[in-house]
């Protein structure tokens, strides 16, 4: 289920429903995790999300295992999306953003979001040419970001 541009209260109610259906408790820790994702454009690893929550809510007793379990639950419910970095793990973002694609730096892991109407139209044309009913797509471009390219150039001098 697509959840683009959903208000936080609606998202929170959906999350509570998913927890109830799974026989799980709604906790302050889980709410803070969802709220952190909602109010950020960051692509988080479980560890970086855990650290952000600990920094923002130092008195909140949240464990890294809770972060992992909650992210998995949210991903299964299609409330978050992830980008896999193989053995280096995943980075997560809330699935409430309008459609976008990603450029991913192979050196530093930086993720740049972009949307290009020409690419979107071309994908639709390709699908049509093949009699394919396009229902969605995920595009990830891999390469080396400008910062890493600039650092390589400085080293060569």
Curated annotation (Swiss-Prot):
It holds the Pfam family FUR. One of its GO terms (biological process) is negative regulation of siderophore biosynthetic process. It comes from the Bacteria. Fe cation binds at residues 99, 101, 120, 137. Keywords: Cytoplasm, DNA-binding, Iron, Metal-binding, Repressor, Transcription, Transcription regulation, Zinc. Coiled coil: none annotated. CDD domains: Fur_like. GO terms for molecular function: DNA-binding transcription factor activity; identical protein binding; transcription cis-regulatory region binding; zinc ion binding. Zn(2+) binds at residues 43, 93, 102, 105, 108, 113. This is Ferric uptake regulation protein. The lineage of its organism: Bacteria, Pseudomonadati, Campylobacterota, Epsilonproteobacteria, Campylobacterales.
């Amino acid at each position: 289920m697509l959840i683009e541009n959903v208000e936080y209260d609606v998202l929170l109610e959906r999350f509570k429903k998913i927890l109830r259906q799974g026989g799980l408790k709604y906790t302050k820790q889980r709410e803070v995790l969802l709220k952190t994702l909602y109010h950020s454009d960051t692509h988080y690893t479980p560890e970086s999300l855990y650290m952000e929550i600990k920094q923002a809510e130092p008195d909140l007793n949240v464990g890294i295992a809770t972060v992992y379990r909650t992210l998995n639950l949210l991903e299964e419910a299609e409330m978050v999306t992830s980008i896999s970095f193989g053995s280096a793990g995943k980075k997560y973002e809330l699935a409430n953003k309008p459609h976008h694609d990603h450029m991913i730096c192979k050196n530093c892991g930086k993720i740049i979001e972009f949307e290009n109407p020409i690419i979107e139209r071309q994908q639709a044309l390709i699908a049509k040419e093949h009699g394919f009913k396009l229902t969605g797509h995920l595009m990830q471009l891999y390469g080396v970001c400008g910062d890493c390219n600039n650092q390589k150039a400085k080293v060569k001098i």
